[in-house]
């Protein structure tokens, strides 16, 4: 999803940074609401989902309370050092950091179609940069993708009453926009500690198949966003109030070629039906790639010595233990987060199990840390 004023995260606000493992913590989302003087207003507002901008404020609030967090630093290189690691920062003025263990959680990279990787500019860009690009003067917008981010962009464009937009076109490979599989039964089987533990124990080839099967438990669009977009399009077509924007959807299609021309800043886009192979050329002033993200291992920040001691599987993916530590032959431990769909499943990048991940790491380092209270799930068992 996008960080827009109306955008929400598809998680309960009880699944914050800490509440699932310590509900009485001062760092809970509810304590954030209380300490920022908005708890009563938040309850009265009766939000069905957590607003994305408010969750970001919550994260920043937690960071402000932690003296050990150093923002504005960039890691240049991680090397072996005695019993652990030496972390060299890009700002050479700052002293290196020495530590016994490290946790790496650099997130994901935008997934860009290969033929466009070297052609990104002010008019062709990934949706992660959406808010940094002006739409002023743009008349015809093409959105590639049909997931949550793509739909949120549609809502945002229609809400901009001062825009010059005349047409919006969506192109995506699916037959229709799939909604997120977030039923109670799906949550019970996938987004719980028991569900995660059951998945981790499965053989690799089965995990790969299940990740495809469970895809829309992670990557689908929220039902209320799908409904909102459809209602906006309905009003746009039939209300006869205000400016009408031409809207087209080309489903089961992909973009196969993009040619920029100097004439009127026009972009010629060739789209192709993935089954019939029929092609059509359309024009756009701007292309927004809502094409998702990909996990990657940040090998560029590790020394060759460290990389040579990290075990990989037959598909050259790093081997990750259930407690998120890499299978590493050196001294110290390397914990790796948001890079383990191949080991931990579609739940791996999701915010909902942040607290559980953190607890697993702490328990692996500190055997005196209080053991968790076992939580029951209604249908989480297996044989």
Language-model regions, residue ranges each:
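Flavin (primarily FAD) cofactor-binding/catalytic cores of flavoenzymes
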Residues: 42-148, 152-383
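Conserved N-terminal glycine-rich FAD pyrophosphate-binding loop of Rossmann-like flavoproteins
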Residues: 1-22, 177-196
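Short, solvent-exposed coil/turn linker segments
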Residues: 5-19, 28-31, 124-126, 164, ...
């Amino acid at each position: 999803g996008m960080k827009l004023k109306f955008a929400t995260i598809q998680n309960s606000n009880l699944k914050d940074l800490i509440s699932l493992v310590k509900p009485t913590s001062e760092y809970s989302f509810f304590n954030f609401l209380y300490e920022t003087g908005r708890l009563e207003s938040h309850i009265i507002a009766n939000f069905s989902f957590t607003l994305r901008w408010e969750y970001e404020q919550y994260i920043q609030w937690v960071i402000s309370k932690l003296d050990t967090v150093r923002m504005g630093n960039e890691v240049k290189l991680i090397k072996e050092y005695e019993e652990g690691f030496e972390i060299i920062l890009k700002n050479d003025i700052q002293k290196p950091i020495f530590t016994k263990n490290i946790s790496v959680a650099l997130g994901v990279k935008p997934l860009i179609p290969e033929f466009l990787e070297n052609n990104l500019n002010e008019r062709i860009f990934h949706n992660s940069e959406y808010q940094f690009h002006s739409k002023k003067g743009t008349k015809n917008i093409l959105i590639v993708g049909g997931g949550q981010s793509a739909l949120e962009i549609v809502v945002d464009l229609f809400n901009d009453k001062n825009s010059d937009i005349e047409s919006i076109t969506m192109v995506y490979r699916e037959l229709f926009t799939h909604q997120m599989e977030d039923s109670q039964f799906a949550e019970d089987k996938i987004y719980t500690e028991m569900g995660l533990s059951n998945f981790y124990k499965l053989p690799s080839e089965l995990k790969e198949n299940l990740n495809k099967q469970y895809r829309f438990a992670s990557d689908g669009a929220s039902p209320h966003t799908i409904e909102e977009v459809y209602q906006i399009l309905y009003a746009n077509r039939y209300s006869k109030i205000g400016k009408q924007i031409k809207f087209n959807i080309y489903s089961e299609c992909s973009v196969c070629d993009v040619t920029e021309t100097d004439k009127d800043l026009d972009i010629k886009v060739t789209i192709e039906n993935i089954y019939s192979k029929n092609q059509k050329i359309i024009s756009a002033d701007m292309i927004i790639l809502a094409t998702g993200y990909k996990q990657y291992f940040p090998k560029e920040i590790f020394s060759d010595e460290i990389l040579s001691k990290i075990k990989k599987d037959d598909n050259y993916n790093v081997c990750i233990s259930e407690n998120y530590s890499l299978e590493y032959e050196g001294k110290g431990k390397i914990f790796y987060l948001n890079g383990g769909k191949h080991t931990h499943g579609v739940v791996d990048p999701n915010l909902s199990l942040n607290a559980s991940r953190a607890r697993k790491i702490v328990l692996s380092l500190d055997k005196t840390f209080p053991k968790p209270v076992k939580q029951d799930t209604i249908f989480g068992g297996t044989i």
